[in-house]
Structures are given as structure tokens and as C-alpha cells.
Amino acid sequence: MINDKILIFGYGSIAIKHKKFLTKLYPKKKIFIYSKRKIKIKNRINKLEDILLIKPKHVIICSNTKNHFKDLIFFENNFKKINILVEKPLFDKIYNYKFKNNKIFVGYNLRFDPIMQFIKNKIRNKKIWVANIMCGSYLPNWRKNIKYYKTYSSKKNQGGGVVLDLSHEFDYATWFFGKLSKKFSLIDKVSNLKINSEDYCNFYGSAKRCKHISIYLDYFSRIPYRLIFLKGKNFFLKANLLKKKNNLF
């Protein structure tokens, strides 16, 4: 990777974080930014043709969720054997398409959190009876200096809503227990937030390694929390991801 070029595709709040970390890790490397916004930043490009000239080996797609599929198609049609990291969620809906030319990764980085690694190790050979997973936050506090009702999170047609925005919970539940089977779910817009995407989700299902799984998500909790409760035979675990604490009994 020493001489490979990096491209950040899109330049919102998450992309800014990626650039910050990459600059720190690789201070001498050229990091290109693709954005149609008129922003003053080094190595910015605003035409897709320029990407073909740059020939990046590593790409991070940080565009709006609704654009992820067409953005990936662009790289699929024009590049081979490059590494592409797509910010979660991968898509806003299911597409019947198989990508073959490049390696594609999705940014579900919670799997690498030490607490999550601890839980994964502890439940490896256990049958969990019940899993209660909860994540509540307040959308207006998510992005500094940006009006929340102008962000993609507030707009259903741009891939916003708690189901996609907070899909880390569905990802790590699948990672822990296997493919989820839905029994029922309640998804709604219930608060007074100025958005047209859903701000509430209550999912109930099961998986191979857990009989009962509930996942609760919302955009309107003034006091944020991210909690996991797992219960089984001679086993009880509570994890608080925001406070980076876990208790095992």
C-alpha cells in the first residue's frame, strides 16, 4: 500500500474522519477526494473521468446510501482488483447483482471493538436463550454545525432512517448468532423530529444460536445508550458500549 493511491468518494462528516485517520497513518501518501461540492481541499476532483486518470488502488465510498449501488457499478465497470470500503449501510434496498472485479468491504467496524470481540469469544460455544439489544440516540446531536433535517438521515428517499443508519445492531447480532429470522417488527415515525424517515424500530426474531432476539432502535433519545443483554444457562452478560463496560455473571 506504500505507493498506492487512495480515493475518498464523497466528502461528508464520515469522509472527513476517514481523511483525518488516513493522513495520520500515511502522512506522505496522496489522498484524493471526489466531491461535486465546492470545497477548498487539497487533491480534490469533481469529475468521474479524473478518477480514471488517478487509478486509485484503495477507495472509500462515503456518498449517500441511495447512491452506493451506482457508485459501486462505476468502479466495477472501470477497475479491477482494487479494494473498496463502503460506508454502512451497503445499500438502501436489495439489488440482484454480483460484483466480481474488486474486493468490497462494508464499514461495520463495531465488530472490531474490544467489547464486541470479548462477547464473541465468550458466546462461541454457548446457546443463548435471549438477546436484548438497544440503541437510542438523538439525531439533532449527530452532526455538529449541520441542521439535522437537511441531512440524508432525515430523508427516507436518500436512505435515511434508524433501520439503515443504526444497522450496526443488525450486523453484530448476525455475527453473534447467525442469520436472523424475523418474527415481527414495528417501524414507524413517532417523534416530533422534522424528518420523513422512520425514527423508531422494534424488531423481534430468532437465529441458530439464539432463540429470542429483540433489537430496539430510535433517533429521539436525549440520553444516548447502546446496550446488550445476553441470557443463557448459567450465563448473563450486560454490555454498555458507550461506557465501554461489560459485566459477565
State where each predicted segment sits:
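N-terminal Rossmann-like dinucleotide-binding module
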Residues: 1-41
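Predominantly a Rossmann-like dinucleotide-binding segment in NAD(P)-dependent oxidoreductases
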Residues: 113-184
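Beta-strand-loop-alpha-helix segment that lines the small-molecule cofactor/substrate pocket
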Residues: 58, 69-111
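Active-site regions of enzymes building and remodeling cell-envelope glycoconjugates
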Residues: 41-51, 101-104
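Rossmann-like NAD(P)-binding element
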Residues: 51-71
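Conserved acidic residues
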Residues: 42, 57, 129
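Contiguous beta-strand/loop segments that form the cofactor/metal-binding neighborhood of enzyme cores
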Residues: 164-165, 170-243
